Swiss-Prot record:
<protein>
    <recommendedName>
        <fullName>Vacuolar arginine/histidine antiporter YPQ2</fullName>
    </recommendedName>
</protein>
<dbReference type="GO" id="GO:0034490">
    <property type="term" value="P:basic amino acid transmembrane import into vacuole"/>
</dbReference>
<feature type="topological domain" description="Vacuolar">
    <location>
        <begin position="63"/>
        <end position="71"/>
    </location>
</feature>
<dbReference type="GO" id="GO:0034488">
    <property type="term" value="P:basic amino acid transmembrane export from vacuole"/>
</dbReference>
<feature type="transmembrane region" description="Helical">
    <location>
        <begin position="14"/>
        <end position="34"/>
    </location>
</feature>
<dbReference type="GO" id="GO:0015174">
    <property type="term" value="F:basic amino acid transmembrane transporter activity"/>
</dbReference>
<dbReference type="InterPro" id="IPR006603">
    <property type="entry name" value="PQ-loop_rpt"/>
</dbReference>
<dbReference type="GO" id="GO:1903826">
    <property type="term" value="P:L-arginine transmembrane transport"/>
</dbReference>
<comment type="similarity">
    <text>Belongs to the laat-1 family.</text>
</comment>
<feature type="transmembrane region" description="Helical">
    <location>
        <begin position="72"/>
        <end position="94"/>
    </location>
</feature>
<feature type="topological domain" description="Vacuolar">
    <location>
        <begin position="1"/>
        <end position="13"/>
    </location>
</feature>
<keyword id="KW-0812">Transmembrane</keyword>
<dbReference type="InterPro" id="IPR051415">
    <property type="entry name" value="LAAT-1"/>
</dbReference>
<feature type="transmembrane region" description="Helical">
    <location>
        <begin position="185"/>
        <end position="205"/>
    </location>
</feature>
<keyword id="KW-1133">Transmembrane helix</keyword>
<keyword id="KW-0472">Membrane</keyword>
<keyword id="KW-0677">Repeat</keyword>
């Protein structure tokens, strides 16, 4: 039975569509994360540079191999997205030297130092001794956070881990045709794939040295992981592969694109291992720091205090 009469074309099309959609939105979580953190301390500049070079080679390769207009436009779209991330790196990291970092996103979390100096212990004692029976929600949250911080501080270790990196699923150009341009396009495809996979190396080193995944959006890795898996599934469930008499030649032609996407899956999985297990303590400390020293909560508490004072003054008069 022909492949076109079975379920595989539908599976391939669905996987291809899902891969395309997730690749389009993959960088948005990281852009939002950087904007909220106001810091790029967790990003390696060499990673971004290699990523950008991969975009450029992919765009040139798509042009030389005569890809469709939408594929070329997609390559330009990814190039613009990555350029925007590079712009964020320049603004927050170079221009402001990460000094705009919001609470909990400093190079090192502050809570271990506070615990070490006994400041959190003193603050907890003050809360216990001076607290009223009608404890405010703000005080309750701070007290819970301090207790948790003290517990975590006793279990902090300097465990090393396999570093990881963020991944990108950029525009994938199709198999090249004939001629010198095609050969050059094939070479550029391999170079682009190597850039995308190799870009992870400096980021791995960065994460390893920091012992933290702060500043890297987990949603970026979720979308790229899903994108890379569905991209490869779309290739191997397509009729072009299933009906091909020479599957080896087909795989050889597609190899740079398979390598560029499948080569990142292992790194994405390592990231989740780091994020949820190896460096979970660091993330917990940063979360507690945001809970303890959130400017919004402090402002709200100050506003309540001011209003209470005003009401008390009006009552006395």
């Amino acid at each position: 039975m022909s492949c076109s009469n079975g379920i595989w074309p539908t599976v391939s099309n669905l996987c291809g569509s899902l891969s395309f959609f997730t690749s389009v939105i993959s960088l948005f979580p990281q852009i939002i994360e950087t904007y909220r953190d106001k810091s790029v301390d967790g990003l390696s500049p060499y990673f971004l540079l290699a990523w950008l070079c991969g975009d450029i080679t992919s765009l040139i390769g798509a042009k030389l191999t005569g890809q469709l207009l939408f594929q070329i436009l997609l390559a330009i779209y990814f190039l613009l997205n990555d350029s925007f991330v590079c712009g964020q790196y320049y603004y927050y990291g170079v221009l402001h030297e990460n000094k705009l970092a919001t609470v909990g996103h400093e190079p090192k979390p502050l809570l271990p130092e506070l615990v070490e100096n006994g400041e959190l212990l003193r603050e907890e004692e003050d809360m216990i001794q001076g607290g009223s029976s009608a404890e405010s929600p703000r005080s309750s949250r701070r007290r819970s956070a301090i207790t948790a911080a003290l517990a975590i501080a006793h279990t902090i270790s300097t465990a090393s881990a396999y570093p990881l990196n963020v991944g990108s699923t950029q525009s994938q150009v199709g198999p090249p045709g004939d001629g010198k341009n095609s050969q050059l396009g094939t070479i550029l495809s391999w170079i682009g794939a190597s850039f995308y996979v190799g870009a992870r190396i400096p980021q791995l080193i960065k994460n390893y040295n920091r012992k933290s995944t702060d500043g890297l959006s987990p949603f970026l890795f979720a979308t790229t992981l899903l994108c890379n898996i569905t991209y490869n599934l779309s290739i191997f469930t397509s009729c072009r592969f299933l009906d091909n008499q020479n599957k080896r030649e087909f795989i050889v032609n597609e190899l740079p694109f398979i390598f560029g996407s499948a080569g990142t899956i292992a790194f994405d999985l390592i990231y989740f291992y780091q994020y949820y297990i190896l460096y979970a303590t660091d993330m917990q400390l940063r979360e507690l720091e945001r809970e303890l020293y959130s400017p919004e909560e402090d402002s709200a508490a100050q506003l309540v205090t001011e209003r209470t004072s005003l009401l008390s003054g009006e009552t006395q008069t």
